[in-house]
A protein has these predicted regions:
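Conserved BB-loop
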Residues: 30-34, 52-73
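C-terminal catalytic-base region of ester-bond hydrolases, centering on the histidine
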Residues: 22-23, 52, 61-64, 89, ...
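Short, conserved loop/helix-junction motifs that constitute active-site signature segments
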Residues: 8-10, 47-48, 118-123, 176-180
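Short aromatic-enriched loop/helix-cap "lid" or pocket-rim segments at secondary-structure transitions
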Residues: 28-30, 66-68, 137-144, 195-201, ...
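Short, surface-exposed "cap/lid" segments of acyl-processing enzymes
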Residues: 2-50
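Short coil/turn segments at beta-strand junctions that form active-site/ligand-binding loops
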Residues: 12-13, 90-93, 182
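Serine-dependent carboxylesterase/thioesterase catalytic core
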Residues: 19-20, 63-65, 71-175
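Alpha/beta-hydrolase-fold catalytic nucleophile elbow
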Residues: 56, 130-131, 220
């Protein structure tokens, strides 16, 4: 999804947002009580007029009755192809990734090197991880426990805590970050979501030297939805972009207009599955109902 500045052929760089499990290109980043173009992706577009701001959407549902998902390897190939189609990788770029999205970005960079498509990895100057479970999440196991009543997707299976493929991916990232020259910024949640800490501090830490994860007093859902331009996450991401894309902050002209494409599919999806949720909930224990409500709001 094109947010701002993407049609500018002379732009100096790109910033790509990548959502996580159960999210989409719009609702993951947008406060739920607001339904307009005034949110932090467009704020960044106004702060950095010479950058393209993008949001990548992909199928990453937790339950099969909500939709489909693909293995991380296939999602990574899909993201790499999308970047090539949009001519992203010809300029310096930064990724901002939430939860599963952070694993997807790491796997995409790994895939780019494996298949000799190194332009993207060479142009990647930094990654901001927002509550990314580098070694998996115990929530995935809890979700899987109710799989008899609500079949889970492959994305849930791959997110289980201490999964071997996640450890291997994180080891690859740690070993290759110095040679790739990729700066890393890490934020992690401190508040539970529906009583569950989705990504604990240990899993949120990729284990990089000179990278200190920053605790944020938000939950797994709200950490990626800054409500103001004075929020810590927004200011931190803005400074990170300015530093690693080496672009000056600019003020928008008074007559500037947003080029954001609205996407409210998440609201429609929830309306369509409400009957299914009620049917499933009748057969769940209290803790399983809590987990189901959590996943519905990711």
């Amino acid at each position: 999804m094109k947010i701002s500045g993407c049609e500018n052929a002379s732009r100096s760089g790109d910033v790509i947002f990548v959502h996580g499990l159960g999210g989409n290109a719009w609702s993951t980043w947008h406060p739920k009580e607001l339904y307009d173009d005034n949110f932090w992706l467009t704020w960044l577009g106004k702060d950095f007029l010479d950058l393209g701001i993008w949001s990548f959407g992909y199928a990453a549902e937790a339950f099969e009755w909500k939709g489909t998902s693909m293995p991380l390897f296939d999602q990574a190939s899909n993201l790499l192809d999308w970047l090539e189609i949009c001519d992203i990788g010809q300029r310096p770029l930064i990724f901002v990734a939430h939860s599963l999205g952070g694993l997807l970005v790491k796997k995409m960079l790994n895939t780019a090197q494996t298949f000799s498509k190194q332009a993207v990895s060479e142009q990647t100057k930094g990654i901001v991880f927002l509550a990314t479970p580098h070694t998996g999440s115990h929530l995935a196991k809890l979700i899987d426990n109710i799989g008899i009543l609500a079949r889970t997707t492959v994305s849930v299976d791959e997110l289980k805590a201490h999964a071997p493929q996640l450890r291997e991916l994180n080891e690859w990232y740690r070993e290759n970050v110095p040679s790739l020259g990729i700066a890393t910024k890490v934020y992690y949640e401190m508040q539970p979501t529906q009583g569950i800490l989705v990504v604990d501090p240990d899993s949120a830490n990729p284990g990089l030297q000179r990278v200190k994860p920053v605790a944020i007093s938000d939950n797994h859902i709200s950490i990626c939805k800054p409500k103001s331009q004075e929020s810590q996450v927004y200011l931190g991401v803005k400074k990170f972009i300015q530093e690693y894309l080496r672009t000056p902050l600019e003020l928008p002209p008074s007559d500037s207009t947003s080029t954001t494409v609205r996407n409210f599919t998440k609201v429609a999806e929830k309306a369509l599955v409400i009957n299914q949720v009620e049917g499933i909930s009748a057969e769940l224990t209290p803790i399983e109902k809590k987990i189901l409500r959590l996943v519905m709001n990711l």
